[in-house]
Structure formats: structure tokens, C-alpha cells
Amino acid sequence: IGKTAIVEGLAYRIKNNMVPNALFGYDLYKLNVTSLMGDYNVAGQSESRVDLLVKELASRQKTIVFIDETHLLVKGSSTASGMDFANMFKAGLDRGEIKMIGATTTEEYEQYILRDRAFLRRFQKVDVVEADRETTIKILMGTYPKLEKQIGVKLNYTDFIKEKIMAFIVDMTDEYKRVYEIASRYPDICLTILSNAFTYALFENSREVKMRHIYQAIANCKNVYEDSKKKDMARFKVEFADILREENTNLDEVI
């Protein structure tokens, strides 16, 4: 639910000097822990890579390393090879030579990291709560320009209509989450829907995302029969039209 995005936000703030003086001049790197660890069966190679990384990080004065899926460091010690990658970081973390941000899910945290108290105590635990409705809308509003640039398709409506579209995505997704017990959380599921809508427009060779692409993306987020999806898309069209009319917006052509 946005763990990597939070770290990217920190990197942005560091770059633009929007952080306390203690963080000025820092470099922030993202480490692909899966690639680093490689094949558990080749224990010597994996340990050698981790050892070199630990020494390199310890030699850098102003470096923060971000490790997503941090539980994999601890999980390694529970495999047949018995490699304890987490243990290789402990001394550097203790001495303050290594500055690390780790991220994982609540489930993986409880299953793996809680078992290694010595590794756990070297971190400050921060829970990232699921975004609420208003926050998710803001995230979507901040995301669509990036999708326009990446995919080459425009969401060519006024800012007012765009915000209504984002709110509609969130509200319809919330309905699906409750009715069909969809496990995905905010903002992830809404970001997927928005991205899919842009992709549908691209596949139609359209230069713009239309509301039909939005309706289709929302309907496809649940695993049901096509007839049900078509009915939902028709319902979405009516409901979104009602929302615009309630706002005294005479833009039926948007629908």
C-alpha cells in the first residue's frame, strides 16, 4: 500500500533539500534483495555478494539503502541452506555504519522478522496504514500525469471532471471490495484500475482515455461473468451522469 512510494518521496525531499540538516547530502539506493541473494543453493556466492555489499555500505558516510521485502533477509536462515543474511548486517547497523530502510507486509513481518529479535531491535517499526478515500483520490490525481507521459494517452477533461472520475473509481472500488471481498487495499487497487484504463485506450489506438475505458477497468477488477461486467458498465454510466448533474455540470458528452 505504497511502501516504495514513501521512500521515493523521501528521496525527492532529500534531492530538493526538504529534509532536516542531518539528512542533507544523502544518497538513497534501492536494493533488489532477490537478485543479491540469488540461488540459495549457491551459498558461497550469495554470502560473498552480501559481504561485499555490507562492506561497501559501511564505507559510505552518507548513504541510505532501501530494501523492499526485508523479510527475505531473515527468511534465508529458515531455508535448507541455513544462510543468515540478516546476521551479516547486524554489526554494521549496530555501529551506525549502515543506514537502512526496510519494508515488508504485516504478514511477512509477523512470520519472519518477529522471530529474529536481534535483527528487529535495530529498526524503528513504522506501520503504513491503508489510505482513506480522500488520500486515495489525491494519489490518483497525482498519478495520472505520469501515466499520460508513460503511455502516451491523455485524460483530456477539466480538473473538476478529473477529480470526479477519481472519486468515482474509489467509490465503485469500495463497493466491489465490500460485496466481493476483494483483498487488495487502497491505493493499490485504484492505481491498477487507472493504469488499466489508460492501457485500454492505448489498445484501441485512442489518444484519449474515455469514460468507457474507466468503466471497463472498474468492471474488470472483479472476477465475474462478462454479462455481469456489461451490466455494471451500463450502471456506472448512469451513476456518473447523475453525479455530474448533481453538480450542475452540463457535460453529458463526458459520460
Locations of regions flagged by a protein language model:
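AAA+ P-loop NTPase nucleotide-binding core of proteostasis motors
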Residues: I1-I255
